[in-house]
Amino acid sequence: LLLMAKLESILDNDFYKFTMQYAVIKLFPRAKAKYQFINRGKHQYPDGFGEKLKEAIQELGKLKLSREEKNFFAETCPYIDPTYFDFLQGYRYDPDEVTVTQEGPELTVKIEGYWYRTILWEVPIMSLICQLYYETTGVQRVSDEEVAAIVEGKMQKYDKLDITIADFGTRRRHSYTVHDLVIKTLKNHNSKTFIGTSNVYLAMKYQTKPIGTHAHEWFMFHAAKFGYKMANLLGLENWADVYRGDLGIALSDTYTTEAFFKQFDKKLTKLFDGMRHDSGDAIEFAQKTINHYISKGIDPNSKTIIFSDGLDYNKVERIVNFCKGKIGISFGIGTDFTNDVRLERMNIVLKMTETLPEDGEWTPVIKLSDEAMKHTGD
């Protein structure tokens, strides 16, 4: 049995990993980080799974940025210095940063190294774990035609809602093949609804826009370095110092939305284009966000909320019905596009657990999102 779980390209990763990597190189080049795999769904991994994963991770070490990829990336992101793309051209995954062990059905994956390097591992390793799981357990997905038909059917419903949608499904996709097919179908569907994907390689392949800004780990690091009280404020200030108003969607739930709004002052509220909702009740969040903008004298319709918390059609419809005409909205849809193949979906994460700011000591990081289920750390 030939196992196919591999990455197509060094850009087969989520856009925000690269945008964060650039910011880390600029601001925190000596910081270190540790990450750990968390098996939320209590999936049982078959014998030999860990070994296969190790092999797949070794293979990642061979990937490098091609000239075509470099040109595409640089043209797409004029706000990133050319030196970054030169750096990326020389970047290679170092499998020594990753430790994989398996005891019975339990899988352990740990990553450790300089943050600016280890930041790229999370998404590829998660997608490899998903794909390998389906391959090694031998379960059959639906046919390619059906995968495309499922996506097409969803898009016809989404079109009627008159909204924009991006694919955010790299990390927990069924496989690269399915992901590729999904983006191809979304692109060929040819309506105004589909606006891009978080996957940089597939954005290049299908001439669409790579989408994303930053993730929880950006704020988790700031909390470890500067204390929780200041994490959101300094995280956003630093982001704005690097990107000067570009990539202006702020992630708001790393330490609960309430704490976020307290620090989201008038300068930041004006500067950022909007925010991303990733946990907790979406409607409640939308109302709080609208209230926040109004309290700062800003028209909520000039701002956007990107919803990305485990969405499907019913959730999206509910959000649209509430937000229409009150505030700008867009949606990032993950597994519901890239892993709707009539099999059990993987519920796994790979999260930063500790960080070593250059002048400190190893500090555990935590995330207190708006849902207890999504908390990590102690």
Ranges and model annotations:
Residues L1-A231, A240-D241, K351-D378:
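Ordered alpha/beta subdomains of enzyme catalytic regions
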Residues L2-K6, I211-D378:
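Glycine-rich phosphate/ribose-binding loops and adjacent secondary-structure elements
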